[in-house]
Amino acid sequence: MRHTYLISAALCIFGASAATAFEPTPDGSSLSKAFPGKSYSPYAQRGIPDRPLWGDTHLHTSTSFDAGAFGNRLDARAAYRFAKGQEVQATTGFMARLSRPLDWLVVADHSDNMGLFDMINAQDPAIMSDAEGNRIATMVANGGDEGVAAALELIDAYSRGQVLSPALAVEAGTKPFRSVWQRQIAAAEEAYEPGLFTSFIGYEWTSLIQGGNMHRVVIYRDNGQKAGMLDPFTTESPAGSINPRDLWKWMANYEQVTRGDVLALAHNGNLSNGIMFPETAQYDGTELDEEYVQTRARWEPMYEVTQIKGDGETHPFLSPNDEFADYETWDKGNLNLSELKEDSMLAGEYAREALKTGLKLEARLGTNPYKFGMVGSTDSHTSLATAQEDNFFGKHSGAEPNPQRPSHIVGQFGDVAILGWEMVASGLAAVWAAENTREAIFDAMERKEVYATTGSRIGVRFFGGWDYTMDDLTSRTPAALGYAKGAPMGGDLSAAPEGATAPNFMVYALKDPIGGNLDRIQIVKGWMDSAGETHEQVYDVVWAGDREPDANGKLPAIGSTVDVARATWTNTIGLGEMGTVWTDPDFDPSQPAFYYARVIEIPTPRWTAYDAFRMGAEVPAESPMETQERAYTSPIWYTPG
């Protein structure tokens, strides 16, 4: 402080006379001569993203009929306040707050029966005068397990293409539907603070095909004026449809009518029983054709790879040599558990296998429909976007924190039940956008410069090219060199320059500031051989400690510092940051391929350990108590040219 005062004083005393000794301020022309084509400031006219923007593409509020029936009473405005870092009272009474605010959020309430819960909650005469409507409304009003049972009954009926009563169906175009849609739009518009926080307008199109999950979130780049011009698409005939092709037609029509922009985000292929990523034909037997692959590639640039209802990167049946494949696997059956899982279904459900299938379809039909970026999100139905293990408010309001929730049934269809401990505290979406605006974030989503995490805020950069060096990585501007010399995550490798024998990849990761250290970075490669068969390989490219791969090339586990009884750990193993430049040792220029990075944290306590420690919850013996959070980048593709 003393030096500051003296300097300030000197400027005050000598400022006037000293100014006369300076050269006149140069004009623009002399500056341009001194710095031709350049600016002194390294940040001027620099349009590359300098930090990931964290958000959730998939959050439900009390407006969704199932969330409302489960007991949620928090609307979209509460969801935005919570995402901005404000303290909110959860439906069950606890005060809740994020450890750090999000940068952006998509409230994506179900378009089907939008407005139904408002009518039920208000005990609208049209509902209460109907026998089935009265019964459901009474169960919802009673709350607790009765409310959960009402929600599951409605979901089960809709999953079979049925309604319990015409009184319990709110169609697009009706006054209740439009009123709620306009309210959702207004909440998003009010919450939008360009440069500080981005609130996207969106909804979920909830297609269920004989219980098979085909859900998509629709995200708007646009403001409320455009978004309000057309009602959201639903699955209810005659105006709606359960066929994704019809959703894509609706999206094309929306853009034509409004001159706006939308995209669709599929999720939970693990609950589709094999129909999410078809290779030969759609669920109804319609053969895949050029129109299908082109249209899907046009409208679905991302896939939600991890969330509360399971992690969807890969499955141990599909990736038996990947020791990290069996992570938070949810795969008992389809969404309503009316059909149990068979191994033959798995190839059409998981992201890594879909990326491989996409190579086949591009060879056969000319376009890769599964050329998607990867994001995580919550799919929370509590209005609270919580994906952090020590701050997890569950799937729905009937599964918010309480001592019984690990062993409590959170969903049951027939004889098959899902217990609370099976919920996954996941995930988040990171976007490399230069500005925190709807336009910049949406454009980054479309170019796939995004990545997924299971809830931890791991920072990851991933670039592919032909001549990266370790000097590039250790320079003070690795990102600038990454863009200048190659393609970022979500992009395509350029044609190989003369003399290049294999692509190389620059990858760098930084731990979550309040999370676990990093165990390792892996690069996952998938490729198609000359016979049309696909393959995969996981490479450990950089890791913490002095471990050495075994005879099979496998790196030993890093160990664990987790104290389950106290729900804590120490960062005495692992590293805070790591990176490398890796060259593909098995590259064949004739084979199409993709590459993505997977970053693994050291073990930390799972949410079930926090529940046991804080609330004395009795956790079933089969429940994991530790987890290894991870990040999945979007791939970089190589196409022979």
PLM regions with names:
Residues 1-20:
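Gram-negative bacterial Sec-dependent N-terminal signal peptides
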Residues 22-76, 80-83, 87-137, 170-173, ...:
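C-terminal functional module detector
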Residues 111-112, 147-198, 212, 238-241:
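Long, well-ordered early-domain segments
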Residues 124-160:
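Substrate-binding cleft of extracellular glycoside hydrolase catalytic domains
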Residues 142, 243, 283-285:
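Ser/Thr/Asn(+Pro)-rich, low-complexity disordered segments
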Residues 177, 236-256, 266:
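Active-site-proximal segments of metallohydrolase catalytic domains
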Residues 219-221:
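Long, charge-dense tracts
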Residues 224, 234-236, 240, 325-328:
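Conserved, charged catalytic cores of large soluble enzymes
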